[in-house]
Amino acid sequence: MAPAGVSLRATILCLLAWAGLAAGDRVYIHPFHLVIHNESTCEQLAKANAGKPKDPTFIPAPIQAKTSPVDEKALQDQLVLVAAKLDTEDKLRAAMVGMLANFLGFRIYGMHSELWGVVHGATVLSPTAVFGTLASLYLGALDHTADRLQAILGVPWKDKNCTSRLDAHKVLSALQAVQGLLVAQGRADSQAQLLLSTVVGVFTAPGLHLKQPFVQGLALYTPVVLPRSLDFTELDVAAEKIDRFMQAVTGWKTGCSLMGASVDSTLAFNTYVHFQGKMKGFSLLAEPQEFWVDNSTSVSVPMLSGMGTFQHWSDIQDNFSVTQVPFTESACLLLIQPHYASDLDKVEGLTFQQNSLNWMKKLSPRTIHLTMPQLVLQGSYDLQDLLAQAELPAILHTELNLQKLSNDRIRVGEVLNSIFFELEADEREPTESTQQLNKPEVLEVTLNRPFLFAVYDQSATALHFLGRVANPLSTA
């Protein structure tokens, strides 16, 4: 009998094959039974709703109320426990949700460059955070709002029957599994190569009631959910209060502008993600090195250097190269560099699209000496703007039917994703002997001009981050 891991990998390959059957504007992936309600759960829901009392509600504490700091180590330990308890179906569901998040992430990323204006800077987007934020709102949505959110998430439905509806609890649990699978790998050899923390802030106008089942459901996605109330009538002051609160609680660099909000806004729904990846066997160079923003402009930036046997491929036809640097057995950093800096936009269009992972099959092992910038990036973006830019249904600018979130009048002011992304050296264990540097078969790869990157985890088929670095010192 084949090992369970082999069987799981084979099934994931089948899912990937189905994923290629996308048509038109909407992506169709099978089998959807992994993420929708089945007849049994529909019957349970019907019985529970019959004569069900009103959901208990509460008013969030004021934003100035004292709050304990987030314990990131405890968060990582919880994710490791989540991963350890996954059965085969849970892992398949995580892979399914990972692919759905990839498709949505590519769709949004492919339309956002002009909106962000990142030609001379650096930025990072998390497909899983985008998907998680919209799935969280779906948890609180009803009727037409729920229909449109389900369509954006990539799961079609045939009718209004319960068995065609996305199961938000399954999806949010799967998203936590996706995070757990990434983090747990770095613990296998007692080395925490990867850190991934997610915090949700639910900021409401004073007096607005939140439903307890909604907030409890968010804990399936992340155990740190922070409901707080504040006055939105002075938007600059409100944004400053939210930033100050989140930085005090997390210690991360965050960004909240409330640019899309108005004085009658009653809700800001914000997702904050911190990623830290350690480059095994890499070291920080003693002196900053030149990074060429364009043919005539350079900046001095901290650089990492390391050597190892990495997967690599150079596309002579489209003039770009890809280097895959492993974090763990199944998680890696993908580095994509145009041969000519002026081709960054073209290469971005070629590689960051729905079938882009196909070129990973062309990678082959090479002994490489790699030099690249140390990355500390912060990116904040309002999903309302990104959905509009991607020509997806612009449902977040209007009054929504979020009656599973609150019975009060809801007017969404902001749906923020804030990413704090760090890439640093881990000098505990060299990947290869540096004595090999002068051997002719060693390929020198130096990322000293604009490039793209992605963090990919094969175990959940999930692209956790997509990024563009035109200037490591300037972030969007």
Curated annotation (Swiss-Prot):
Beta-decarboxylation of Asp-25 in angiotensin-2, by mononuclear leukocytes produces alanine. The resulting peptide form, angiotensin-A, has the same affinity for the AT1 receptor as angiotensin-2, but a higher affinity for the AT2 receptor. Changing residue 259 to T: Risk factor for essential hypertension and pre-eclampsia. GO terms for biological process: angiotensin-activated signaling pathway; blood vessel remodeling; cell-cell signaling; G protein-coupled receptor signaling pathway; G protein-coupled receptor signaling pathway coupled to cGMP nucleotide second messenger; kidney development; low-density lipoprotein particle remodeling; maintenance of blood vessel diameter homeostasis by renin-angiotensin. It holds the Pfam family Serpin. Coiled coil: none annotated. Disulfide bonds join 42-162. CDD domains: serpinA8_AGT. GO terms for cellular component: blood microparticle; collagen-containing extracellular matrix; extracellular exosome; extracellular region; extracellular space. Keywords: Disease variant, Disulfide bond, Glycoprotein, Secreted, Signal, Vasoactive, Vasoconstrictor. The keyword Disulfide bond applies. The keyword Transcription does not apply. It comes from the Eukaryota. GO terms for molecular function: growth factor activity; hormone activity; serine-type endopeptidase inhibitor activity; type 1 angiotensin receptor binding; type 2 angiotensin receptor binding. Changing residue 198 to M: Risk factor for hypertension. Gene3D superfamilies: Alpha-1-antitrypsin, domain 1, Antithrombin, subunit I, domain 2. The modification Beta-decarboxylated aspartate is found at residue 25. It is found in: Secreted. Expressed by the liver and secreted in plasma. InterPro entries: Angiotensinogen (IPR000227), Angiotensinogen_serpin_dom (IPR033834), Serpin_CS (IPR023795), Serpin_dom (IPR023796), Serpin_fam (IPR000215), Serpin_sf (IPR036186), Serpin_sf_1 (IPR042178), Serpin_sf_2 (IPR042185). Residues 1-24 form the signal peptide. It is linked to Essential hypertension: A condition in which blood pressure is consistently higher than normal with no identifiable cause. PANTHER family: ANGIOTENSINOGEN, SERINE PROTEASE INHIBITOR, SERPIN. Belongs to the serpin family. During pregnancy, exists as a disulfide-linked 2:2 heterotetramer with the proform of PRG2 and as a complex (probably a 2:2:2 heterohexamer) with pro-PRG2 and C3dg. Essential component of the renin-angiotensin system (RAS), a potent regulator of blood pressure, body fluid and electrolyte homeostasis. This is Angiotensinogen. It comes from Homo sapiens (Human). The gene is AGT.
